[in-house]
Amino acid sequence: MKMFQPRRGFSCHLAWFMLQTTLYASWLLGLFPFTFDSRRKQLKRSRWLLLYGFVLHSLAMCLAMSSHLASKQRRKYNAFERNPLLEKIYMQFQVTTFFTISVLLLMNVWKSNTVRKIANELLTLEGQVKDLLTLKNCPNFNCFVIKKHVAAIGQFVISIYFCLCQENSYPKILKILCCLPSVGLQLIIMHFHTEIILVYRYVWLVNETLEDSHHLSSSRIHALASLYDRLLKLSELVVACNDLQLILMLIIYLIGNTVQIFFLIVLGVSMNKRYIYLVASPQLIINFWDFWLNIVVCDLAGKCGDQTSKVLKLFTDLEHDDEELERSLNEFAWLCTHRKFRFQLCGLFSINHNMGFQMIITSFLYLVYLLQFDFMNL
């Protein structure tokens, strides 16, 4: 992937290293079940890697469930004895999380052909647009790649910490292996994030090419419009491939944060264990940050697509002697006006800042409802 190799600067090197790490980790865990055909320069699906990933994560899920049940039999949290409602909510959250991770891992296998099409389209674009676009370093691309990986590393550390803290007779190596399902969950989310940020980078390069070019031929405008159309179709394919997984993931983030805050209130206020605020704050911050990054990257790509219309307007407002050039510009502007980068879940809910704020407010209101409902037990 020469186009995405570091060109200059520490952030470029770091972003490239993180993308490589995600790729090799996904291969190692069977979550990216493809091999590279060097002759055709395309990815092809490997049934052995699919089978390996499915068996590995099935065993890890069974191990994690066994470890959780063993810990539950040995010790019951004091907070659960203090507040029975908290125990019920926590158990339902555990079941929901287990179900979500299982579905995401199964969907990763089921939709592997679609993922292959997306990856191959990105590889094809890489080879075809070198002479068409003005290649530059995209600051937001590097920034969001680094931020997402830092958030994922934080999630990994928290998962390992909680697995090691489980009170059962399992050796530490088995406790660490119990983290594989949550690691797989983060890598699957990382795939979606990477696909969206790569689409954003191409759209950003289209805008930069238009802004930097004082004299554009009709053939180049037509080629840019064709590229823009391919990026629109690619973004639709990415969302169609990941909409169910993204819905489940967003639900898990919000439920998890609500349960955790309620847990902190019971421990900190009812049981007067104020130190728990300091211990649990990093996890809460990382959860909200990770949730918000998935919202922002979709909103960023959508706004970048809207920016293309504004850049084209600068060209269409000018008078052109070349009728073919004017026709190409009008067709490109028409495409940008009637088809936009909108990342919608199941074709209904747009992923943007407004949706993110609404979900956070809904989660907060649900927490208030819990406190009012169970006020006498606090």
UniProtKB/Swiss-Prot annotation:
Which keywords describe this protein according to UniProt? Cell membrane, Glycoprotein, Membrane, Receptor, Transducer, Transmembrane, Transmembrane helix
Query: Which biological processes are named by the entry's GO terms?
Result: monoatomic ion transmembrane transport; sensory perception of taste; signal transduction
Q: Name one Pfam family in it.
A: 7tm_7
Q: Which organism is it from?
A: Drosophila melanogaster (Fruit fly)
User: A cellular component term (GO) from this record?
Assistant: axon
* InterPro entries in UniProt: 7TM_chemorcpt (IPR013604)
| Transmembrane parts of this sequence | 14-34, 49-69, 89-109, 144-164, 179-199, 246-266, 355-375
Where in or outside the cell it occurs: the entry states: Cell membrane
**Which parts of the sequence lie on the Extracellular side of the lipid bilayer?**
35-48, 110-143, 200-245, 376-378
Stretches of the chain found on the membrane's Cytoplasmic side: 1-13, 70-88, 165-178, 267-354
Q: Which residues are glycosylated?
A: N207
Protein name per UniProt: Putative gustatory receptor 22f
Its membrane topology is listed as: Multi-pass membrane protein
Protein family:
Belongs to the insect chemoreceptor superfamily. Gustatory receptor (GR) family. Gr22e subfamily.
Give the UniProt tissue specificity note. Taste bristles in the foreleg and labial palps.
